[in-house]
């Protein structure tokens, strides 16, 4: 695959938020503003073709909760059939052994999301009603049995920044760990009281205590904004420059290019390209 050393730097991955609904109610979620409408897999062909011709290599299917999308299997087959590496970002609650078996050789990565290593925190945050952490370990085990790599996504929030995630990470055995600092975006999650934000010092303390884990990366708020190529469930280009979520038509993207809103240097700066 192409790496950061490529002479002309281009975005190598893109996130398609295929479905806006979710069965969890995480307090800090900045995707709850997504439209509840959605497109069929065939409607995504133009977007995927554009991304393929541009040089994108990996597609991340996200939500909402992508396993609620009624055409998930067909979408996975489409993306894989077009030659992309395929990742799915999920809360893991609806993933079964049967689905994993069907996706063996189709899905390359599964990203599993947590905010704390304390189940009481997860319940307070809105990530299910109990048993979330145990289920994440079980789903990770399923993935490994079927040859699917695991990425553990940790959102570092006010309830969890001081805790030690090492024992839980060892249980999950992920090939990659990504730690996000909880982010507030205008028009996304600024409509409710902020109970999740942490200070620079708190995030740095969390980083210092975990940075020697070999497969781990950290994304502060400034690393995140304007560094992701994203699409909403209706195929609109989703951008967050200036800490404000906005939606731009695909036609504008095709005419003006990804560089209009997304910073390729920030993309590479957050270690977005790795061995996938």
Curated annotation (Swiss-Prot):
Q: Which InterPro entries match?
A: Aldolase_TIM (IPR013785), Elp3/MiaA/NifB-like_rSAM (IPR006638), RSAD2/Viperin_antiviral (IPR051196), rSAM (IPR007197)
Molecular function terms from GO: 4 iron, 4 sulfur cluster binding; lyase activity; metal ion binding
Q: Which cofactor does it need?
A: [4Fe-4S] cluster
State the SMART domains in the record: Elp3 (SM00729)
What EC number is given for this enzyme?
4.2.-.-
Domain (Radical SAM core) spans 6-216
UniProt keywords, alphabetically: 4Fe-4S, Antiviral defense, Iron, Iron-sulfur, Lyase, Metal-binding, S-adenosyl-L-methionine
- GO terms, biological process: defense response to virus
At which positions is [4Fe-4S] cluster bound?
22, 26, 29
Q: Which domain of life is it from?
A: Archaea
For this protein, the record's Pfam families field holds: Radical_SAM
Reaction equation(s) it catalyzes: CTP + AH2 + S-adenosyl-L-methionine = 3'-deoxy-3',4'-didehydro-CTP + 5'-deoxyadenosine + L-methionine + A + H2O + H(+)
Keyword flag Hydrolase: no
**PANTHER family named among the record's database cross-references:** RADICAL S-ADENOSYL METHIONINE DOMAIN-CONTAINING PROTEIN 2, S-ADENOSYLMETHIONINE-DEPENDENT NUCLEOTIDE DEHYDRATASE RSAD2
Tell me the NCBIfam families matching this sequence.
viperin_w_prok
Recorded protein name is S-adenosylmethionine-dependent nucleotide dehydratase
> Per UniProt, what is the name of the gene that codes for the protein in this document?
vip50
């Amino acid at each position: 695959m192409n790496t950061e050393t490529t002479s002309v730097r281009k975005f190598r991955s893109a996130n398609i938020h295929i479905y806006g609904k979710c069965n969890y109610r995480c307090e800090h979620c900045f995707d709850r503003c997504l439209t509840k409408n959605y497109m069929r897999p065939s409607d995504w062909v133009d977007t995927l073709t554009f991304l393929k011709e541009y040089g994108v290599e990996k597609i991340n299917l996200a939500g909402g909760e992508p396993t609620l999308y009624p055409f998930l299997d067909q979408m996975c087959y489409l993306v894989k059939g077009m030659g992309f590496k395929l990742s799915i970002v999920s809360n893991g609650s609806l993933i079964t052994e049967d689905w994993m078996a069907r996706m063996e050789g189709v899905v390359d990565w599964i990203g599993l999301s947590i905010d704390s290593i304390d189940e009481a925190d997860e319940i307070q945050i809105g990530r299910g009603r109990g048993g979330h952490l145990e289920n994440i370990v079980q789903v990770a085990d399923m993935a490994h049995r079927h040859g699917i790599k695991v990425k553990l996504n940790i959102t570092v929030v006010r309830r969890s920044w001081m805790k030690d995630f090492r024992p839980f990470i060892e249980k999950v055995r992920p090939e990659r760990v990504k730690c996000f600092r909880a982010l507030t975006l205008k028009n996304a999650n600024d409509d409710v009281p902020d109970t999740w934000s942490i200070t620079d010092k708190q995030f740095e303390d969390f980083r210092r205590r975990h940075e020697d884990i070999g497969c781990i990366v950290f994304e502060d708020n400034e690393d995140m904004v304007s560094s992701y190529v994203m699409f909403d469930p209706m195929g609109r280009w989703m951008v967050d420059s200036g800490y404000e979520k906005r939606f731009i038509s695909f036609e504008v993207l095709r005419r003006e290019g990804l560089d209009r809103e997304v910073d390729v240097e920030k993309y590479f700066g957050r270690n977005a390209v790795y061995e996938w």
